[in-house]
Amino acid sequence: IILLWKFLTFIYPPVIIPKIDSVIKFLLNILSSSLLIKEIIKTLIRMCLGLFFGILASIVCTIIFSKYKLLNEIFYPIVQFLQVIPPITWLVLAIIWLGLGGKPAIMILAISTFPIMTISLMNEIKNFNKNFLQVAQLFQLSSSEEWRYIKFPILYQTFETAFLVCFSTGIKLIVMAELLTTNSGIGGQISTARINIETEGIFAWSIILIFIYYGIGGTLLWIKRTGCIRKLWFHKLSEKVLITK
């Protein structure tokens, strides 16, 4: 990639393809300023809020849909329909409804996360092994205990996979929304660089975004592969079941 980049700098002017040394210089200026941490934190807070609201709504709806068949038949097709609507449509509506700023970014991530997580969890529930539900009957678990001790631990692996998908798309959606709606956050800084025709700034902030993506994404993937949270959860819950019953 670097060799291709170097080659393209001989063909195109710096305003289109900036030189590597100018991008490195701009990147070092960002790293040495207080702007870096402040803007990264703003982007990460928006991403966390968007994921939180989307996942919370998904968990609530999943519990309701699995418990009430009529509501599932009425509203689940709507959830599937939401997945088809492109994020840019929601972004335009969010700007109209909420105005400019960080709120539209949070909204489109929440709406994009909601159908992905809900559909993944509902598909897993439909494929539940009946032996697990028989365990709930054996221990005479209540409905809430059945969710807590049986269904949630089983769904967690599906949740992890869906969460990785939501994260990988979410960080890009947040930056895109910031680019179009605000001058803060990583997307806002890219927008400022675009207005000032600082192509090296766009490249520099994009490099920072790539490192953030692989840093957080790699950590989440490691947690999923090792299964440390899942193992701890099963161990704790098995102890609680034995103590309770």
Language-model regions, residue ranges each:
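N-terminal signal-anchor transmembrane alpha helix
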Residues: 1-11
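Periplasmic/extracellular loop-to-transmembrane helix junction in inner-membrane transport proteins
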Residues: 11-52
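Transmembrane-helix boundary motif in ABC transporter permease subunits
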Residues: 49-79
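Generic hydrophobic transmembrane alpha-helix motif, especially the helices
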Residues: 80-116, 124
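Transmembrane alpha-helices
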Residues: 107, 111, 143-176, 204, ...
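Short helix-to-coil transition segments within interhelical loops
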Residues: 125-128, 135-155, 195
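Hydrophobic alpha-helical transmembrane segments of polytopic membrane proteins
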Residues: 187-224
